[in-house]
C-alpha cells in the first residue's frame, strides 16, 4: 500500500511539531491544525481575506491550515498564521495593520492556543 499524507518534508516536520506542541501545552487547537494539514493538497484550505474579515474579531489570531488568498479586504487588526500566503494577501494584510506569520511562529507566540480561530 502506498503511503498517504503530505510528501513535503517541511510540511511533515511542521505536523510533527504541531502534534508535540498540542501534547506539551494541552492545546487541542494545534492538534486540529495538524489533522487539517494532513489532508491531501487538493483538499487543503484556501481562504480569502474577505472570509477572515467576516469571521475574525480584533486582536485574535486567525489560523489557516492552508493558503491565504488576496480577494477582499481586511479591516480588522488580527494576526494571520498560515501555511502560505499569496503575494497580494501579504500586501493587503500589512496595509491593514495586521500581521502575517507562519504556523511555526504562531506556536512559539501562543503555545496554549488561546484567542485563536481556525478558518477553513
From Swiss-Prot:
<dbReference type="InterPro" id="IPR001196">
    <property type="entry name" value="Ribosomal_uL15_CS"/>
</dbReference>
<keyword id="KW-0687">Ribonucleoprotein</keyword>
<dbReference type="InterPro" id="IPR036227">
    <property type="entry name" value="Ribosomal_uL15/eL18_sf"/>
</dbReference>
<protein>
    <recommendedName>
        <fullName>Large ribosomal subunit protein eL18</fullName>
    </recommendedName>
</protein>
<comment type="similarity">
    <text>Belongs to the eukaryotic ribosomal protein eL18 family.</text>
</comment>
<dbReference type="GO" id="GO:0005840">
    <property type="term" value="C:ribosome"/>
</dbReference>
<dbReference type="InterPro" id="IPR021132">
    <property type="entry name" value="Ribosomal_eL18/eL18-A/B/_CS"/>
</dbReference>
<keyword id="KW-0689">Ribosomal protein</keyword>
<dbReference type="GO" id="GO:0006412">
    <property type="term" value="P:translation"/>
</dbReference>
<dbReference type="InterPro" id="IPR022947">
    <property type="entry name" value="Ribosomal_eL18_arc"/>
</dbReference>
<dbReference type="GO" id="GO:1990904">
    <property type="term" value="C:ribonucleoprotein complex"/>
</dbReference>
<dbReference type="GO" id="GO:0003735">
    <property type="term" value="F:structural constituent of ribosome"/>
</dbReference>
Amino acid at each position: 500500500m502506498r503511503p498517504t499524507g503530505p510528501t513535503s518534508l517541511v510540511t511533515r516536520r511542521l505536523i510533527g511539531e504541531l502534534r508535540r506542541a498540542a501534547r506539551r501545552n494541552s492545546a487541542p487547537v494545534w492538534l486540529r491544525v495538524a489533522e487539517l494539514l494532513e489532508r491531501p493538497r487538493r483538499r487543503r484550505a484556501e481562504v480569502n481575506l474577505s472570509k477572515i474579515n467576516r469571521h475574525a474579531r480584533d486582536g485574535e489570531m486567525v489560523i489557516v491550515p492552508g493558503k491565504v488568498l488576496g480577494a477582499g479586504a481586511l479591516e480588522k487588526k488580527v494576526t494571520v498564521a498560515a501555511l502560505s500566503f499569496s503575494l497580494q494577501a501579504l500586501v493587503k494584510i500589512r496595509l491593514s495593520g495586521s500581521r502575517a506569520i507562519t504556523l511555526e511562529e504562531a506556536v512559539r507566540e501562543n503555545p496554549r492556543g488561546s484567542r485563536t480561530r481556525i478558518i477553513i
